[in-house]
Amino acid sequence: MITLIAAVAENNALGKDNQLLWHLPEDFKRFKALTSGHYIIMGRKTFESFPKPLPNRTHVVISRQKNYQPEGCIVVDSLEKAIEVCPKEEDVFVIGGGQIYKQSIAIADKVDITRVHHSFEADTFFPEINLDEWQLVFSEFHPKDERNQFDFTFQTFVRK
């Protein structure tokens, strides 16, 4: 199963200058719980935005740079090759960035979103979720608090 996972603003903003636009510890906790022990597919810039590789996950990085080989990662030059290197029986998570989401939404089985209830100026956006193709099967609202600076909702969509 291929799942897209992302934190997305009301205007579908993902980030700016290769950085997230908010700090939501509850979102990080959910991301870790869902992706731990699985293959995660990402673009090079998304990988480079992490201070170090994420523990307990197999990193598949998509890059067109020929000699790009960060330690402990599988590097491929296309989304198709990224999917091919992941075991078929595994749950695979696509974790960004914007172009990788745009390419992969057509082949995804599921989308796990943290919808941040605010709009931001951004340079990277998540593709529209077409409700003719996707069904919302889970929604859980969380008000902002001392640790999470914005209201947000965990949402899960499955392909119809």
What are these model-predicted stretches?
Residues M1-K160:
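Enzymes that bind and transform nitrogen-containing heteroaromatic metabolites
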